[in-house]
Amino acid sequence: MANLFDQLKEFTTIVADTGDVEAIKSVKPYDATTNPSLLLKASTIPQYAPLIDEAIAYAKSQSGDKAQQIEDAADKLAVLIGLEILKHIPGKISTEVDARLSFDTEAMVQKGRKLIKLYEDAGIAKDRVLIKLASTWEGIKAGEILEKEGINCNLTLLFSFAQARACAEAGVFLISPFVGRILDWYKAKTGETYTAETDPGVQSVRKIYAYYKEHGYKTVVMGASFRNTGEIIALAGCDRLTVSPNLLEELKATEGKLERVLVDNGVTKQRPPLLTEKEFRFDLNEDAMATEKLAEGIRGFVVDQNKLEKALAEKL
């Protein structure tokens, strides 16, 4: 009998959530995603030391200002790690915009353009890169602007239906609704244990997937942030799933029959009026879990971005 990983690949695009090239070589995903936390982890891998040196040399060549050098080195390192990963995948790499910019639309647009230029200068076409943005109102608006320039975006830290709806209406290429972090919040609040079927993170992605398909939105749904393989199996059929290498290996090692759960029935309904900024902010605020997790997620990425920049600053 085939393993779960091979069966899942038949109807869901598998994406590796890692900055580790060796892990990517092992699991052979189609796409890969990175974030500031994964880049910080990757920067400690010995084989990446030359990339750090290259990022430092690049930053020094661009500016004499220390603060600008640190920013340029961090951006260059993110792209250099992305370039290494692209050598081993046929699809796209997601590279994240500095989380400190999460409430500044123009700054996110500028950073997205800069990252794409760094990839293009290295010979990588922009259609192989997704710019990752936090799913704040400002991030979604930045995504809308970048998409119109032909720069595809991955809207991340997505915990609520309001965020998902606004992303679809903005016409972004892809969203990353989080599963495990939603489960974490409910477990902490209720003390309950959840099955894959009752998992609130799984239910959230299923609702978003169904809404997108029945309203004819082209935005790709890529479930993210998994705590166990049960959550992944419960979302079989989702457009894409981005999964850590350890859970991908677990799926490879497990044999059994995998049933497709999410299916696009091809029926489309009329779309509702566009969500206004006021409605978005109110709906997000009404959702305590999403409000807390979005804020926590941004703070966490900022902490790791600062750690990465501190390490780079010591080498400048």
Swiss-Prot record:
Superkingdom, natural source: Bacteria
Catalytic residue list: 132
GO MF annotations, alphabetized: transaldolase activity
CDD domains, A to Z: Transaldolase_TalAB
Subcellular location: Cytoplasm
EC number: 2.2.1.2
Recorded metabolic or biological pathway in which this protein acts: Carbohydrate degradation; pentose phosphate pathway; D-glyceraldehyde 3-phosphate and beta-D-fructose 6-phosphate from D-ribose 5-phosphate and D-xylulose 5-phosphate (non-oxidative stage): step 2/3
Family statement drawn from the similarity comment of this UniProt entry: Belongs to the transaldolase family. Type 1 subfamily.
Function: Transaldolase is important for the balance of metabolites in the pentose-phosphate pathway.
Subunit and partners: Homodimer.
Protein name per UniProt: Transaldolase
Native species: Methylobacillus flagellatus (strain ATCC 51484 / DSM 6875 / VKM B-1610 / KT)
Gene field: tal
